[in-house]
Amino acid sequence: MAHALVTFRDVAIDFSQKEWECLDTTQRKLYRDVMLENYNNLVSLGYSGSKPDVITLLEQGKEPCVVARDVTGRQCPGLLSRHKTKKLSSEKDIHEISLSKESIIEKSKTLRLKGSIFRNEWQNKSEFEGQQGLKERSISQKKIVSKKMSTDRKRPSFTLNQRIHNSEKSCDSHLVQHGKIDSDVKHDCKECGSTFNNVYQLTLHQKIHTGEKSCKCEKCGKVFSHSYQLTLHQRFHTGEKPYECQECGKTFTLYPQLNRHQKIHTGKKPYMCKKCDKGFFSRLELTQHKRIHTGKKSYECKECGKVFQLIFYFKEHERIHTGKKPYECKECGKAFSVCGQLTRHQKIHTGVKPYECKECGKTFRLSFYLTEHRRTHAGKKPYECKECGKSFNVRGQLNRHKTIHTGIKPFACKVCEKAFSYSGDLRVHSRIHTGEKPYECKECGKAFMLRSVLTEHQRLHTGVKPYECKECGKTFRVRSQISLHKKIHTDVKPYKCVRCGKTFRFGFYLTEHQRIHTGEKPYKCKECGKAFIRRGNLKEHLKIHSGLKPYDCKECGKSFSRRGQFTEHQKIHTGVKPYKCKECGKAFSRSVDLRIHQRIHTGEKPYECKQCGKAFRLNSHLTEHQRIHTGEKPYECKVCRKAFRQYSHLYQHQKTHNVI
């Protein structure tokens, strides 16, 4: 068994303050990724020392450089001072780890790989630096590393592109060794006039103008300007996600992604907008949000005129018009124009829903679905339309609503020329012409055009009714049903019938009611020719011909063709009668029964005969009365062929034949 003395110093990457200032934002993010991953690998080898300050700062997303000291003495926590270097020799920070030679070599390869990413970038930088001292430092450093690797044959080496300092030398001498960097010298780009602190940053910037991309991915052919970008990109092909959230188990390709994700669980939003006091998880989100106040939108689509704040979103949008979908699901072959859409789609196959609502226990595949769902409990509607003041739970709902005011509909159907504001709406609409129903119920085989309709349908089988009325406790399968139901408690009825003065909570109720006066029955049964005022009545009627009775009572086994009949029947077993008359105290199991009963007290008779002017409380009474004028007798006795206007009369007659 081989024994190796491994310290955090062996896998740390050190920079002076001036060297740190030369790194751009992307390089600093890479430094954070490499340092954290190396430390995690060291812990997996058995390192049990106290967590270094630099790791704590990096995990918190803070700047790792200490600013309390003067310019020549400042250093990053990765740069060890004489005091800290001596401290490493104590038993507290050096641990003897018993590992097999093979396992050490395997981990060593991983650490070298992570360090090499950063080493290549830093060595590239030294090629552009004009300071001779920095070049000499780079050469001497390579010699030291080479010497260390050749002499430490017995002990496996974990050396990356480390800066190995003599503990007897001061930090000032260390800075001299690394070369002097004159921060006063500015370098201007001749193309656009941008100014940079050093030649390296200028050279990287100029690649934007030249379009130079020297690093190519062998898997997909995508090219990158920097080697570290290629290395990070390759993780998408390998599927490597080394950073795992301990709260929900979700894994990430980069540490900053994990850091941003963890803020979802903590609820911490450290980046505040000074204009509206809105909080955000990341600085990027805040930057994007600020453009709402400034109105800056620089990228315009030539096809439809839509403008975007970021070029990233603009390029994604362009794929809608070109039809390009480069991201394909390996499970089902479905392709997507945006990588994020593929990532979300893949969770359908895994079935993983790690985000759970603490209020109702409902789980979601994506965190923002949970965030949107929570607003239903809190009653929050943070997205307000500036045109009409209407508020929404979800930003997407607001964006859809805005098209009402703008009237822009750039996506037209090629079959019927109907136009839509969103490509997704057009895609769904096209299924009407193609007959495509991609969402199938595994229980009964019924297929649907929309996933949301399938989800609602599946609740018929599961019996789940997640939407509960806080006023009366009644539950519903569909959100739209509870929205309609809530208006029962408000008593607001803004829709009034001009003929009889009756008021309704909803416009479509008024439309259906007006057919009573006009006699219009647009929904006709193809089997028997019977017509109906409402589509729902026709659908229920069709079940008579099919003999289908899908609603079974678990208490007594009785089956029903209509859901309404089934719901009414269940109240026999429960005895629940939530609708009470304020006049006489009589209670009813259905609101419609209460409404009909109240006409006894009010004297209301909305159904009037056009022949003689007689009025009735119920539409069925009017129908029976009209048969006096028409002479219609639809109920015939099968024994003697005598016919009757009302079913009750036939029932009484059949007793004479001893049929009943």
Curated annotation (Swiss-Prot):
Keywords: Cytoplasm, DNA-binding, Isopeptide bond, Metal-binding, Nucleus, Repeat, Repressor, Transcription, Transcription regulation, Ubl conjugation, Zinc, Zinc-finger
Entry's transmembrane regions: none
GO BP annotations listed: negative regulation of DNA-templated transcription; negative regulation of translation; regulation of transcription by RNA polymerase II
GO cellular component terms, A-Z: cytoplasm; cytosol; intracellular membrane-bounded organelle; nucleoplasm; nucleus
Domain of life: Eukaryota
Subcellular location: Nucleus; Cytoplasm
Tissue expression from the record: Expressed in several fetal tissues, including gut, heart, brain, muscle, lung, testis and liver.
InterPro entries documented for this protein: C2H2-ZF_domain, KRAB, KRAB_dom_sf, Znf_C2H2_sf, Znf_C2H2_type
Domain KRAB as annotated: residue spans: 6-77
One of the Pfam families matching this protein, by short name: zf-C2H2_6
Glycyl lysine isopeptide (Lys-Gly) (interchain with G-Cter in SUMO2) crosslink, residue number(s): 109
Gene Ontology molecular function, alphabetical: DNA-binding transcription factor activity, RNA polymerase II-specific; mRNA regulatory element binding translation repressor activity; RNA polymerase II cis-regulatory region sequence-specific DNA binding; zinc ion binding
Chain ranges of zinc fingers (C2H2-type): 187-209, 215-237, 243-265, 271-293, 299-321, 327-349, 355-377, 383-405, 411-433, 439-461, 467-489, 495-517, 523-545, 551-573, 579-601, 607-629, 635-657
Protein family membership: Belongs to the krueppel C2H2-type zinc-finger protein family.
Subunit structure comment from the entry: May interact with MVP.
Role played: May act as a transcriptional repressor.
The protein, known as: Zinc finger protein 540
Originating species: Homo sapiens
Encoding gene (name): ZNF540
